[in-house]
């Protein structure tokens, strides 16, 4: 029985074991799942629910679901099995999910059974199903405004659909909570309204006379009705009625010389009052006609400037100063410009005929240089005469020249705003050629310089240093040839016919041969600096250096010039035009218009400035008009250069040195320095509220002088006894001019400080042999910039030492002279300050006179020594309270002598006549008084001061 039960049990176990090994089917799950998980939660709600089925059920292990596996990169979820028998499962988040980080998650899931036994052998897996999990948002974020403060401006009297828009954003991820549903104005009683999009408009017309600035608070709500944590502030400014105009410019613009280019309108902008424009044109005009001749140019004289610019010499002045040698300009009206240059006025009925011989330097014979190579240079101020209009020509110069081949002729005329040059190479055979230029400078009634270079067949006209090519060149066969006779006329021209009878409206002028010339085409305007030079022509660089304007309008920002912008500057740089179609681009371009003055020492003063604007609008009916802008540039006073002359102010030399062939140098160690004082503002201390100024001296590297003068302090030089010497060869080599008179010596011409130092150190003072001169004072002064800046007055005192042993004397006389010389010889440190005697009489070279002088000198010495000693003793006795019986009257020299050592050397000349000695003594006493008075007058500080103040002006 027992065996039977055991057998049955084993059979059943074998049957069960045989059944578990039959895991024939894989688990099954849905193909796709949709899941939802709430933000900040971890449970996922799936649709359909997560169940896995296995056809091996109800077998143990093979029919059970042991778990789920998730596949995907970085899946923040996990799957758990709730019931192995039913295959129910659950998906949950490993940690709370964030919707703002990721709204949706997609991954795959797979189920697996328990296999064929507890060890999980022969496990089978289901297919992979796709799971989509959406994270549901929670309204955790409040709206946030993009700006904390919003500003806008409105014009009074208008209703705006939108003044400005405020904007808030929400950090939530869902459309429900991330969208702003509406805005609200929290401040009550404001004339503004805000819509759901944040647009603010005014509900009534605002007035500038009322509230000028409105401030109110705005908040925002999302669609979950959550309010913004921080509200926004809004400021709306009310402006007066808009007037189209230029804004942000200064009427006064200060320019410091040497500042380079200075922007005139750095902050300017065009207010169009919202009127759309399609074209803008602005003209900036700088008025410089009142500065010298039309604009600021180099301040040097014409002669100095020609040397600085390297211009060739040999020009002939055709309109010189009226004088005995230049009487042809005597009948013209003469004026002077601000730079003291000579100006001639031609009134339309006057002309001058320049003589071909004599001072003009033109000669009456053949003039080869004027045939086809010459430069004509002049200043002209001309406008269209109302009575003449633009119909009649006006002749500037008319010239017929005789050369080897015959006669040539040229004339320069103006006709309205045209200037024409007619050239006839050869009257006998060639035909005339006419060159025409149309220039606004010809008729603008302003000063301009013209230089015409003729190198036939090439003709170039320079106006203010800028070259212009002819606009038209043509042959003119209708012109009748002029009479074949040399003649040069300025201000008019003669007709071609030779007739002694005057015609109506024509004047006659006699020629050199006595035949009259019928004159017509008179010039009406101003001329100055009219010169001609034959042969070598002036180069473009030289002409530009001589006559170009050094100030004007400037524009250099072409790289950032916007699209469609145009910039035009006239040749004289006094007019600049801008044209464009975009307001912002136009503003940017106008902000870079600048004023420039390249002169280191610019002419100070005011330059008026005008900005004129013309605009074109899309709507002609409502097109705006921009008013004119007027201002001025103030060129400040430049830092004046300080020219300092220094050196030895006193020296003494023996007379033999002055009588040498080269004399004695007056300024052997002269030093000339030039510096500029700059006023700079130092950084003020925190405890000091004022401004601290400091003066800094900075030496300039390059400086020129244009003249120096050596003059006499006191009487003029006596040409028979003294003279000033200077090396003429050295001056001529450097192109300097010398004027040497008995009152002064001047050096004129532009040169560097080093050259002037070298030349002035060579200036020497020479005396004739035997001239009894003892002292002289010389005054030296220099200047630059045509005398605009002057140096200090450097005074040198020269003492001439005369020796008494220049002729033979007895030994006892010589010893007396030596004693006298020792008695009056000053110590070495006072050698340059010895008193000068103004004794002008010649010394009598006789032994008797020498003896008389020695005696008189000895007597004077004794008197002086006695007076000094008595005065000293009187002071000592008075100070110590001497005996009552002692007399202290200093007027009595014979009262007493002290017992100090006194050595007296007497010259025993008692055998000589006492009468002569007495006479000589009286004469010597008178002479001493005169010398004393003259010496005091010469060395009086008030006298020197008076002479310095009354010193004559520069003569160079």
Swiss-Prot record:
Biased segments, Basic and acidic residues type: 943-956
Stretches assigned to the Extracellular side: 20-847
Highest taxon, organism lineage: Eukaryota
GO molecular function list: calcium ion binding; cell-cell adhesion mediator activity; enzyme inhibitor activity; neurexin family protein binding
Pfam families linked: CLSTN_C
Keyword Calcium set for record: yes
Sequence segments annotated as region (Disordered): 916-956
Record note on what altering residue 896 to D does: Increased KLC1-binding
Record field: compositional bias (Acidic residues): 927-937
Domain Cadherin: 29-145, 146-246
Record's subcellular location: Postsynaptic cell membrane; Endoplasmic reticulum membrane; Golgi apparatus membrane; Cell projection, Dendrite
Gene Ontology biological-process annotations: adaptive thermogenesis; cold-induced thermogenesis; excitatory synapse assembly; homophilic cell adhesion via plasma membrane adhesion molecules; inhibitory synapse assembly; L-ascorbic acid metabolic process; motor learning; negative regulation of excitatory synapse assembly
Leader sequence segment: 1-19
Tissue-level expression: Restricted to the brain (at protein level). In the cerebral cortex, found in the somas and neuropil of all layers. Expressed at highest levels in neurons of cortical layer 5 and, at lower levels, in neurons of the upper layers. Highly expressed in Purkinje cells. Also found in a few scattered interneurons throughout the granule cell layer and occasionally in neurons in the molecular layer (at protein level). In all layers, high levels in a subpopulation of presumptive GABAergic neurons (based on morphology).
Post-translational modification: Proteolytically processed under normal cellular conditions. A primary zeta-cleavage generates a large extracellular (soluble) N-terminal domain (sAlc) and a short C-terminal transmembrane fragment (CTF1). A secondary cleavage catalyzed by gamma-secretase within the transmembrane domain releases the beta-Alc-beta chain in the extracellular milieu and produces an intracellular fragment (AlcICD). This processing is strongly suppressed in the tripartite complex formed with APBA2 and APP, which seems to prevent the association with gamma-secretase.
Keywords per UniProt: Calcium, Cell adhesion, Cell membrane, Cell projection, Endoplasmic reticulum, Glycoprotein, Golgi apparatus, Lipid droplet, Membrane, Postsynaptic cell membrane, Repeat, Signal, Synapse, Transmembrane, Transmembrane helix, Ubl conjugation
Membrane topology value: Single-pass type I membrane protein
Description of the deletion phenotype: Mice are defective in both excitatory and inhibitory synapse development. Mice also show reduced body mass and increased energy expenditure. Mice also display reduced marrow volume and cortical bone mass without alteration of trabecular bone microarchitecture. Conditional deletion in neurons leads to a significant reduction in number of excitatory synaptic inputs. Conditional deletion in the cerebellum causes major impairments in motor learning due to a large decrease in inhibitory synapse, associated with a robust increase in excitatory parallel-fiber synapses in Purkinje cells.
A GO-annotated cellular component: Golgi membrane
UniProt topological domain (Cytoplasmic) ranges: 869-956
Subunit structure and binding partners: Interacts (via cadherin domains) with both alpha and beta isoforms of neurexins (NRXN1, NRXN2 and NRXN3). Directly interacts with APBA2. Forms a tripartite complex with APBA2 and APP. Interacts with low affinity with KLC1. Interacts with SLC23A2/SVCT2.
Domain writeup: The cytoplasmic domain binds synaptic Ca(2+).
Family: Belongs to the calsyntenin family.
Functional note: Postsynaptic adhesion molecule that binds to presynaptic neurexins to mediate both excitatory and inhibitory synapse formation. Promotes synapse development by acting as a cell adhesion molecule at the postsynaptic membrane, which associates with both neurexin-alpha and neurexin-beta proteins at the presynaptic membrane. Regulates the balance between excitatory and inhibitory synapses by inhibiting formation of excitatory parallel-fiber synapses and promoting formation of inhibitory synapses in the same neuron.
Protein name: Calsyntenin-3
Organism expressing this protein natively: Mus musculus (Mouse)
């Amino acid at each position: 029985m027992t065996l039977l039960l055991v057998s049955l049990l084993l059979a059943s176990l074998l049957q069960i074991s045989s059944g578990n090994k039959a895991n024939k089917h894989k688990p099954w799950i849905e193909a796709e799942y949709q899941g939802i998980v709430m933000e900040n939660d971890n449970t996922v709600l799936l649709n359909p629910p997560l169940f896995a089925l296995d056809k091996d059920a109800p077998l143990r292990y093979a029919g059970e679901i042991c778990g789920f596996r998730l596949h995907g990169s970085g899946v923040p979820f996990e799957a758990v099995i709730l019931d192995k028998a039913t295959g129910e499962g659950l998906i949950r988040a490993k940690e709370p999910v964030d919707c703002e980080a990721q709204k949706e998650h997609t991954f795959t899931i797979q189920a697996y059974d328990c296999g064929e036994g507890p060890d999980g052998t022969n496990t089978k897996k289901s297919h992979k199903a796709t799971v989509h999990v959406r994270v549901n948002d929670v309204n955790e974020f409040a709206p946030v405004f993009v700006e904390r403060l919003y500003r806008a401006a409105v014009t009074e009297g208008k209703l705006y659909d939108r003044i400005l828009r405020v904007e808030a954003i929400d950090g939530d991820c869902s459309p429900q909570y991330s969208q702003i549903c509406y805005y609200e104005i929290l401040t009550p009683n404001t004339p503004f309204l805000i819509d759901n999009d944040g647009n603010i408009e005014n509900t009534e017309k605002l007035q500038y006379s009322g509230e000028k600035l409105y401030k109110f608070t705005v908040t925002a709500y999302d669609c979950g009705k959550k309010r913004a944590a921080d509200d926004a502030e809004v400021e709306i400014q009310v402006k007066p009625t808009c007037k189209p105009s230029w804004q942000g410019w200064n009427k006064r613009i200060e320019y410091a010389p040497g500042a380079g280019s200075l922007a005139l309108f750095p902050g300017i902008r065009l207010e169009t009052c919202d009127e759309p424009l399609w074209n803008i044109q602005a003209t900036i005009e700088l008025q410089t006609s009142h500065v010298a001749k039309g604009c600021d140019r180099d301040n040097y004289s014409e002669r100095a400037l020609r040397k600085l610019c390297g211009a060739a010499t040999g020009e002939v002045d055709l309109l010189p100063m009226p004088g005995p040698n230049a009487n042809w300009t005597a009948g013209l009206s003469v004026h002077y410009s601000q730079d003291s240059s000579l100006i001639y006025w031609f009134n339309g009925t006057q002309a001058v005929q320049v003589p071909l011989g004599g001072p003009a330097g033109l000669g009456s014979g053949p003039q080869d240089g004027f045939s086809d190579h010459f430069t004509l240079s002049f200043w002209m101020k001309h406008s269209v005469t109302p009575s003449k209009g633009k119909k009649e020509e006006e002749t500037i110069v008319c010239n017929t020249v005789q050369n080897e081949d015959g006669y040539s002729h040229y004339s320069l005329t103006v006709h309205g705003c045209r200037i024409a040059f007619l050239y006839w190479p050869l009257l006998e055979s060639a035909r005339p050629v006419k060159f025409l230029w149309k220039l606004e400078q010809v008729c603008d009634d302003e000063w301009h310089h013209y230089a015409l270079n003729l190198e036939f067949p090439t003709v170039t006209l320079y106006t203010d240093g800028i070259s212009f090519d002819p606009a038209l060149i043509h042959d003119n066969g209708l012109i009748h040839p002029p009479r074949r006779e040399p003649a040069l006329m300025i201000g008019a021209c003669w007709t071609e016919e030779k007739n002694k009878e005057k015609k109506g409206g024509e004047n006659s002028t006699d020629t050199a041969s006595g035949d009259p010339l019928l004159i017509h085409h008179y010039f009406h305007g101003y001329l100055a600096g009219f010169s001609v030079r034959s042969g070598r022509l002036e180069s473009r660089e030289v002409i530009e250096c001589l006559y170009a304007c050094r100030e004007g309008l400037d524009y250099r920002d072409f790289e950032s010039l916007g699209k469609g912008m145009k910039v035009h500057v006239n040749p004289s740089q006094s007019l600049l035009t801008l044209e464009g179609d975009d307001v912002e681009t136009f503003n940017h371009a106008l902000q870079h218009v600048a004023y420039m003055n390249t002169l280191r020492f610019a002419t100070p003063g005011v330059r008026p400035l005008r900005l004129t604007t013309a605009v074109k609008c899309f709507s002609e009916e409502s097109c705006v008009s921009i008013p004119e802008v007027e201002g001025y540039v103030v060129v400040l006073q430049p830092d004046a250069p300080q020219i300092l002359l220094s050196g030895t102010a006193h020296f003494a030399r023996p007379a033999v040195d002055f009588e040498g062939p080269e004399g004695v140098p007056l300024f052997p160690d002269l030093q000339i320095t030039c510096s500029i004082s700059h006023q700079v503002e130092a950084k003020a201390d925190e405890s000091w509220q004022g401004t601290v100024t400091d003066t800094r001296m900075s030496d300039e590297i390059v400086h020129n002088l244009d003249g120096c003068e050596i003059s006499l302090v006191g009487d003029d030089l006596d040409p028979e006894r003294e003279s000033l010497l200077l090396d003429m060869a050295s001056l001529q080599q450097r192109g300097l001019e010398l004027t040497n008179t008995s009152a002064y010596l001047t050096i004129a011409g532009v040169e560097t400080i080093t050259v002037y130092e070298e030349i002035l150190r060579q200036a020497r003072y020479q005396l004739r042999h035997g001239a009894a001169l003892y002292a002289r004072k010389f005054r030296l002064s220099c200047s630059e910039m045509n005398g605009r800046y002057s140096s200090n007055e450097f005074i040198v005192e020269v003492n001439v030492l005369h020796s008494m042993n220049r002729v033979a004397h007895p030994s006892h006389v010589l010893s007396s002279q030596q004693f006298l010389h020792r008695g009056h010889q000053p110590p070495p440190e006072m050698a340059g300050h010895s008193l000068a005697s103004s004794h002008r009489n010649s010394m009598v070279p006789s032994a008797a006179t020498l003896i008389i002088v020695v005696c008189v000198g000895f007597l004077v010495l004794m008197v002086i020594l006695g007076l000094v000693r008595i005065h000293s003793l009187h002071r000592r006795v008075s100070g110590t309270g001497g005996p009552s019986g002692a007399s202290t009257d200093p007027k009595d020299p014979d009262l007493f002598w002290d017992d100090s050592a006194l050595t007296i050397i007497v010259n025993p000349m008692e055998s000589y006549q006492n009468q002569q000695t007495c006479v000589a003594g009286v004469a010597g006493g008178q002479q001493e008084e005169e010398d004393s008075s003259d010496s005091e007058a010469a060395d009086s500080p008030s006298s020197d001061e008076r002479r310095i103040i009354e010193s004559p002006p520069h003569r160079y």
